A protein has these predicted regions:
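Generic short beta-strand
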Residues: 2-3, 53, 160-162
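Structured interaction patches on ligand/partner-binding surfaces of diverse proteins
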Residues: 5-34
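A short beta-strand-turn-helix
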Residues: 50-75, 92-96
């Protein structure tokens, strides 16, 4: 039996197990998946062609895909809970890594569940967020897609953040209240 775990680099950590199967008998074998403590692993999938509506100040209010907005390569998607402490804490954590995230140069798409929630967001409360952020509205169910594909148990618990790429691979997920989100994002980014 061969099992494997795909890494973000494209490499695969495989494990081969040999065993005997006897006639008329059930053979039980433990399924073992190798993991790397050093390299970023692919932990799920996400459609980079998923659509959202950028806020008007982003240049265009026409629906577009994450691929169109971010270009090829890795990107971050965050689904925000407006005026909720877990989201506020996450945004402050991200702001503390502004220089590193801007140096990385990839886009971060931060989404609100609807237009009303987007209107309640006070951007001025977070002046130090990276300039690579695109704000938008989740008009086409990105939050639900992430929750389903990543098998999140509490679909309504926000914020949700992922790092994914345009090959539809997810290498990082965070949901709800998290301490040190900015540091976790950068650790993953540096491992790519």
């Amino acid at each position: 039996m061969v099992t494997g775990t795909r890494l973000a680099s494209g490499a695969v950590l495989s494990k081969t197990t040999f065993f005997n199967i006897l006639p008329e008998k059930t053979t039980e074998i433990e399924l073992v998946m190798r993991e790397s403590e050093d390299e970023v692993q692919v932990i799920g999938n996400f459609n980079s062609e998923s659509l959202f509506t950028p806020l008007p100040d982003a240049g265009s209010a026409a629906r577009q895909s994450l691929l169109q907005a971010c270009g090829r390569g890795y990107f971050v998607v965050g689904v925000l809970g407006v005026n909720q402490e877990p989201t506020n804490h996450a945004l402050r954590d991200i702001a503390s890594f502004k220089a590193d995230l801007e140096k990385w140069g990839r886009k971060m798409v931060l989404l609100f569940l609807d237009e009303a929630k987007a209107g309640k967001f006070a951007r001025e409360s977070f002046p130090d967020l990276p300039s690579t952020i695109i704000y938008g509205i989740d008009t086409d169910g990105i939050a639900a897609q992430i929750a389903e594909s990543m098998k999140l148990k509490h679909k309504e618990s926000l914020p949700i953040f992922i790092i994914a790429d345009t090959f539809n691979r997810v290498v990082f997920v965070s949901q709800g209240y998290t301490i040190g989100l900015g540091e976790q994002l950068m650790r993953t980014i540096k491992g790519l």
